[in-house]
């Protein structure tokens, strides 16, 4: 015969499960926004964003962006990643499943399928911007001097791309029933689960995502700058005039001398070149009579 203590330890058959049973081996609902979860998220943001600073110093010096351009580029990406992060936190608490596992599944889908969708979205928007000639909406270009309106417009476009990406990932999550996949069931410590979901795995994946997406957002500006530089060089070559000067030789033949019109060659050098070329005599052909030289 068991006493009240035994019944309390097992929990009543018709009542709610005990606190130990509900919390053992799984994150509780809302655990992602508790104090420990918020601390891990802040630490992750600082560490992951520092990879963008490392990327800037790894760029060649002649292609390295000024700090203001770098900040405008990376701030768009930071805002987009914050949107994805809080969307994942919200979606993780919608069901009764383990929120840590759901967050991790959402995050991994964002890092795989989502990366492809972001690339397609950036390319599609770039084509539309070039077609409509919206110069202020070209990713990575903010005018000279810098215009805040250009940054706001590009940031809005990038957020639209992120909304599209998150919507597709959410549909994939629902169709394939990935919410039933329990990736973290073998781990029994909820705090360790939270650290894996919020810090350890996102650190490596976010570093890669920040690095790749930064190339998406800055590529158009670098390409356009190279095209403008190439066009300027082409114009400078086409703009230089070329003239011909004729000099009579002793044999009353004419030799053509090509002289560039960039005024870098002095007149004395031109005359010296003419004197050097005029003494050249043409080779006289020998006359033949009946096949024998005369």
Curated annotation (Swiss-Prot):
GO biological process, one term: store-operated calcium entry
TM region(s), chain numbering: 29-49, 69-89, 102-122, 156-176, 194-214
Record note on domains: The GXXXG motif may mediate oligomerization. The C-terminus is necessary for its localization at ER-plasma membrane (ER-PM) junctions as well as for the store-dependent rearrangement of ER-PM junctions.
Gene expressing this chain: STIMATE
GO cellular component entries: cortical endoplasmic reticulum; endoplasmic reticulum membrane; endoplasmic reticulum-plasma membrane contact site; membrane
Primary localization: endoplasmic reticulum
Keywords of this entry: Endoplasmic reticulum, Membrane, Transmembrane, Transmembrane helix
Lineage top rank: taxon: Eukaryota
Topology with respect to the bilayer: Multi-pass membrane protein
Protein name: Store-operated calcium entry regulator STIMATE
Known tissue expression: Widely expressed.
Classification of source organism: Eukaryota, Metazoa, Chordata, Craniata, Vertebrata
Family the entry assigns: Belongs to the STIMATE family.
Subunit details: Homooligomer. Interacts with STIM1.
Function: Acts as a regulator of store-operated Ca(2+) entry (SOCE) at junctional sites that connect the endoplasmic reticulum (ER) and plasma membrane (PM), called ER-plasma membrane (ER-PM) junction or cortical ER. SOCE is a Ca(2+) influx following depletion of intracellular Ca(2+) stores. Acts by interacting with STIM1, promoting STIM1 conformational switch. Involved in STIM1 relocalization to ER-PM junctions. Contributes to the maintenance and reorganization of store-dependent ER-PM junctions.
């Amino acid at each position: 015969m068991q006493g009240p203590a035994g019944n309390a330890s097992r929990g009543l058959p018709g009542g709610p499960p005990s606190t130990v049973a509900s919390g053992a081996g799984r994150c509780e609902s809302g655990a992602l926004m508790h104090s420990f979860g918020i601390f891990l998220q802040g630490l992750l943001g600082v560490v992951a964003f520092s990879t963008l600073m490392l990327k800037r110093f790894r760029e060649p010096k002649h292609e390295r962006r000024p700090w203001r351009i770098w900040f405008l580029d990376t701030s768009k990406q930071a805002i987009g990643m914050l949107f994805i992060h809080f969307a994942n936190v919200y979606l993780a608490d919608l069901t009764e499943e383990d929120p840590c596992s759901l967050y991790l599944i959402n995050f991994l889908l964002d890092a795989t399928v989502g990366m492809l969708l972001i690339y397609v979205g950036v390319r599609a928007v770039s084509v539309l911007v070039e077609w409509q000639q919206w110069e202020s909406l070209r990713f990575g270009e903010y005018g000279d001097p810098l215009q805040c309106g250009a940054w706001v417009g590009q940031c809005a476009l990038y957020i639209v791309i992120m909304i599209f990406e998150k919507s597709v990932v959410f549909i994939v999550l629902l169709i394939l029933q990935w919410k039933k996949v329990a990736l973290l069931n073998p781990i029994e410590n909820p705090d360790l689960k939270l650290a894996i979901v919020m810090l350890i795995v996102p650190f490596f994946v976010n570093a890669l995502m920040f690095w790749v997406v930064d190339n998406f957002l800055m590529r158009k500006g670098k390409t356009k700058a190279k095209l403008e530089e190439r066009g300027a060089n082409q114009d400078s070559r086409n703009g230089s005039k070329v003239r011909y000067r004729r000099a009579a030789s002793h044999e009353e033949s004419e030799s053509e001398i090509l002289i560039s019109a960039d005024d870098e060659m002095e007149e004395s050098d031109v005359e010296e070149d003419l004197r050097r070329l005029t003494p050249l005599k043409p080779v006289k052909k020998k006359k033949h009579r009946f096949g024998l030289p005369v």
